[in-house]
Regions:
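Cell-envelope/extracellular polymer assembly enzymes that use nucleotide-activated donors
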Residues: 2-5, 23, 31, 158
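Conserved short acidic donor-positioning loop in nucleotide-sugar-dependent glycosyltransferases
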Residues: 11-12, 24, 37-41, 64
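Membrane-interface aromatic/basic loop that binds lipid-linked glycans or pyrophosphate carriers
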Residues: 19, 26, 44-45, 84, ...
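Catalytic core of nucleotide-sugar-dependent glycosyltransferases
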Residues: 176-184, 189-217, 236-249
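Short aromatic/hydrophobic "clamp" motif used to bind/position activated sugar donors
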Residues: 59
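Glycine-rich, basic loop-to-helix element that forms the pyrophosphate-binding segment
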Residues: 38-54
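Donor-binding/catalytic cores of nucleotide-activated saccharide
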Residues: 64-170, 181-195
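Short, well-formed alpha-helical segments that are part of the catalytic scaffolds
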Residues: 8, 12-26
Length: 287
């Protein structure tokens, strides 16, 4: 019986995919699904294709340039009888070029190491929007018809927001079973700057509206980041396009003005929090 399905979107160097696949333990209860995105449709499309092929009770997502640590096998053993909707596990990160520790998993580490279980659960549900380090129940996914948006960047945020909203029972394992590889030529960074800004704005806006629909009083302040960055650089045409994207998504002028007024405060809180945690402050679009 297939218990786990690991889905890997692939568009990049073959050696990275080979390393990722080789890090997945050989088990009779595990299915590895590689979706080759030769036409550049995006990781969201590839993950949706993988979901349609998944036979496991739980699905786990990996990026082809990342890999699993040996403890991943023990993690799978420990959750064989689990019935939670989503099971979170931890990660570390390295810089691809130097092999030195990187910042990409710092936000997850901070959540995992929190001594406040209420804060931890809220942040895992609504702040940790990456698809990796989650084992998500396939029956839960089917019940709520959860899928990835097929944008070129941030295609995972709407999926993760739905998982966070609808999951009735979650479990947390703090072992670092996954390694996130940070490198300079990622998909998010290689896309045309203005297209990236608009995708970024659109996907965070959709996520915010979904949270509001279910009465969750928080919003991704980074929704405004592309527009505010464009304003600061006097790229007013790009800023207006971002504004239009948020209006098309359904935001009223009054709500957007309210968010703009509070944005400097939220940005400062983010910088202070990251500085206190010893994290590198990364505010580029797409990170």
């Amino acid at each position: 019986m297939i218990r786990f399905s690991v889905i890997i979107p692939h568009k990049g160097p073959q050696w990275q995919l080979d390393r990722c696949v080789a890090s997945i333990p050989q088990r009779d209860d595990l299915q590895t699904i590689v979706i080759h995105d030769e036409e550049g449709r995006g990781a969201g499309w590839a993950r949706n294709q993988g979901l349609s092929q998944a036979e496991g009770s739980y699905v786990i997502f990996a990026d082809s340039d990342d890999y699993f640590h040996p403890c991943f096998n023990g993690f799978l053993d420990s959750i064989k009888e689990e019935t939670a909707d989503v099971i979170f596990f931890n990660a570390d990160s390295i810089a691809m070029e130097s092999g030195k520790p990187s910042w990409r998993a710092n936000h997850l580490n901070r959540i995992m190491h929190s001594s406040d279980p209420v804060w931890q659960e809220r942040h895992l549900r609504f702040h940790f929007t990456e698809p990796w380090c989650k084992a998500v129940s396939m029956s839960f996914i089917r019940e709520h018809a959860i899928r990835f948006n097929e944008s070129k960047i941030l295609n995972d945020i709407y999926f993760s927001t739905q998982v966070g909203i609808f999951a009735k029972r979650i479990k947390v394992y703090t072992d670092k079973c996954y390694c996130v590889c940070n490198h300079s030529d990622s998909t998010a960074k290689s896309k045309k700057a203005e297209d990236r800004m608009l995708d970024y704005t659109r996907e965070t806006a959709k996520s915010n509206l979904l949270l509001a629909k279910y009465g969750i009083k928080r919003y991704h302040s980074r929704m405004l980041r592309p527009m505010m960055t464009a304003v600061c650089h006097l790229h007013l045409g790009s800023a207006y396009k971002c504004w239009k994207e948020m209006r098309i998504c359904g935001y009223s002028i009054h709500t957007l003005l309210y968010y703009i007024i509070r944005y400097p405060r939220d940005l400062m809180k983010l910088i202070i929090r990251k500085a206190q945690a010893g994290e590198i402050v990364k505010l580029q679009i797409g990170n």
